[in-house]
């Protein structure tokens, strides 16, 4: 067992070489048991208008080649000129440890690879995903007083490469054509919103997303920070997207880095405009432009980072700790030590960000969870994570309110919550 600690200590903080590491096969295992249980009945249902991109000059498509569609709800009253863009999450091709092309082939037949799940352009669609964009994306005033009446754009995730694909021609796989156009999809949404929805008149814009969409938020914020006029109050919020360049003890490689390198090459995302600001400084390490711990150095927009210190998605898939899926209490003492070291690495990154970026806010719990903007943070939890503030900590809702409404965002001391309890002694954690 000491072998694993030696491996992690040797590689956890190891800065990369330029070559692509070879990863050993591994299986992340099933997710934590138990079906998703909505904690607040009714708050998972949101109705949007479907918008279809029909501009022949865009290259937007989903993996299966279907026309790209996104969801929109019109702002009201004081929110008519305020906008929130939400990048939908859903992992990425190859996260399971299998070949990314095979993974994309399977994904293309699911809601994460097509737009055919949505009705025709102009029709309404009720979004009912248990981890869906509620919380700060909710249209219920009593639940989301700060942002309920904003214009909201849900950028559908259907390219499998973190909304970054930019490949001109499809990849043929067993007679199936796979299209990688994530960059083109987001670009088309922005142009559509400017041309038809009133984005040109925006006074406030928040860029946000969860999980893979949270990762996309870092990437796109870096690019879009010079896209909008200086008169716009531009902010960003990434939820569960701070995936690190950690070492996977089972695959015996920097697995997440490996997957990002493969995806960048497979989908030509490295040559899209979204990477231009980043790759200028990282010509030989373009893969770093897809990983939050490196991207944050270049982001100058005020940002609010929301993340678990013990991310129940990242620990199995990126570090190789599949014991998490059977419940953290099944992890060996060695594995518990590795969890603590990964948490320490995350907090080290956060401390460095806080020193350099005083306008940024933070909300980080030490519970085995993933995605906080929804009512529930993971399988089996029934607590209202967005609203609840038990045991003397700041709720996500209150922290976000204090950060966003802090005038010039120079004093964010009341909107920083970094849990100091570990998961074993944290009364706020349900999944132990």
Predicted segments with their positions:
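Cleavable N-terminal signal peptides of Sec/SRP-targeted secreted and luminal proteins
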Residues: 2-19
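C-terminal His-loop and adjacent cap/lid subdomain of alpha/beta-hydrolase
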Residues: 18-432
């Amino acid at each position: 067992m000491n072998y694993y600690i030696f491996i992690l200590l040797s590689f956890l903080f190891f800065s990369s070489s330029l070559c692509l590491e070879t990863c050993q096969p591994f299986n992340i295992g099933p997710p934590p048991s138990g079906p998703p249980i909505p904690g607040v009945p009714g708050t998972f249902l949101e109705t949007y208008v479907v918008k279809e991109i029909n501009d022949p000059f865009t290259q937007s498509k989903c993996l299966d080649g279907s026309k790209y569609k996104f969801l929109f709800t019109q702002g009201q009253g004081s929110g008519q000129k305020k906008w929130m863009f939400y990048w939908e999450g859903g992992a990425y091709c190859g996260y399971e440890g299998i070949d990314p092309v095979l993974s994309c082939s399977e994904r293309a037949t699911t809601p994460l690879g097509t737009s055919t799940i949505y009705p025709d352009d102009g029709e309404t669609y009720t979004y009912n995903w248990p981890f869906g964009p509620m919380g700060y994306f909710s249209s219920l005033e009593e639940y989301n007083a700060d942002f309920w009446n904003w214009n909201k754009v849900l950028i559908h995730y259907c390219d499998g490469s973190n909304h970054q694909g930019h490949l001109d021609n499809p990849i043929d796989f067993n007679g199936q054509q796979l299209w990688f156009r994530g960059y083109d999809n987001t670009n088309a949404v922005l142009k559509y919103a400017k041309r038809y929805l009133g984005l040109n008149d925006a006074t406030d814009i928040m860029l946000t997303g969860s999980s893979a969409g949270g990762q996309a938020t870092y990437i796109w914020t870096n690019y879009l920070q010079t896209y909008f006029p200086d008169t716009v109050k531009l902010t960003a919020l990434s939820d569960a997207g701070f995936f690190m360049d950690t070492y996977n003890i089972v695959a015996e490689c920097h697995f997440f880095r490996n997957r990002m390198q493969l995806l960048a090459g497979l989908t030509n995302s490295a040559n899209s405009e979204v990477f231009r600001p980043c790759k200028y400084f990282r010509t030989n390490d373009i893969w770093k432009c897809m990983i939050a711990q490196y991207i944050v150095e270049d982001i100058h927009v005020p940002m609010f980072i929301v993340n678990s210190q013990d991310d129940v998605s990242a620990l199995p898939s990126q570090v190789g700790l599949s014991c998490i899926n059977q419940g953290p209490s099944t992890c060996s003492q060695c594995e518990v030590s590795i969890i603590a070291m990964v948490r320490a690495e995350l907090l080290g990154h956060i401390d460095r960000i806080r020193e350099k970026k005083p306008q940024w806010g933070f909300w980080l719990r030490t519970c085995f969870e993933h995605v906080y903007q929804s009512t529930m943070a993971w399988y089996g939890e029934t607590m209202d994570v967005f609203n609840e503030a038990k045991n003397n900590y700041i709720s996500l809702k209150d922290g976000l309110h204090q950060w966003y409404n802090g005038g010039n965002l120079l004093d964010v001391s009341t909107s920083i919550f970094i849990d100091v309890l570990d998961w074993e002694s944290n009364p706020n954690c349900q999944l132990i």
